[in-house]
Amino acid sequence: MQPEDFAYLSELESDFWWFVGMREITAALLDPVCAPRIDRQVLDDGSGTGGNLSWLKRYAGNGEVAGIDVTAEALSFCKKQGHQLLVQASATDLPFPESRFDLVTSFDVLVQIPEVGSDESAISEIFRVLKPGGIAFVRGAAYEWLKSDHDAALATHHRYSLEELVGKMKAAGFEILRSTYANSFLLPVALVRRLVLKRIGLARGSDVKPMPSALRWVNAPLTAALRAEAAWLRRGETKLGFGLSAICLARKP
């Protein structure tokens, strides 16, 4: 990622439709298996600029939320928000003992690991640091054929099918609780933005950037679209059959 991308992310994470809506979807899946308790230990594996660290405190109660990221620049934004339990480290080599955490989240981190097979190492590390019965929430960008300049700008090296992500979680030893695509309503928009416009040179760079003032009105309806998906996913064992993100919720036996 470029330095300006970290600044954009930090600016947008609190109220930009994608971040707000995807947190709603995360809650829809996590809430049934992470009931409030007073001492849950939580790790955000690849915390970026820290937008999810404060949000994850809802699952920690009086416990702790730790964050790791491979880049010092990203962690500097976390520190500016007052977060202290931060470590600069790779997702493929977590600096924690076995069975340390009750919940580990990985938001679009596996897709940024460049070495072939290293995503499997990262999943194995999540398994290692979780306590028996601990929960893993793993999300990654979906569909390799949807790669675009947005992925290059955000250092996304691979996009997953849901079947591939679930298969790798199972291979690491996880019990799969839920799996689904997400950001489904907006897949047609992404197809136009990233594939059609790209071919005629009108779609370049990352989609993560401040919204022009003339278009800020779309933030609310786009947020509402993702909230509608979250409401659907709260209905028992429902899932979405396609979307821009692949999600796997799993438990360490």
Per-region residue spans from a language model:
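Conserved catalytic loop of SAM-dependent methyltransferase domains
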Residues: 51, 178-227, 241-245
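Short N-terminal helix/helix-N-cap motif within the alpha/beta-hydrolase-1
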Residues: 51, 73, 114-118, 148
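Short, glycine-/aromatic-enriched active-site segment of Class I SAM-dependent methyltransferases
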Residues: 136-158, 164-167
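A short SAM/SAH-binding and catalytic strip from SAM-dependent methyltransferases
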Residues: 103-117
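Conserved N-terminal segment of class I S-adenosyl-L-methionine
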Residues: 1-97, 103-107, 123, 243-246
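A short glycine-rich, Lys/Arg-flanked "PGG" loop and its adjoining helix->strand segment in the class I
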Residues: 120-135
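A SAM-dependent methyltransferase catalytic signature shared across enzymes that methylate proteins
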Residues: 166-182, 224, 228, 251
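C-terminal lobe and adjacent flexible extensions of AdoMet/dcAdoMet transferase-like proteins
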Residues: 225-253
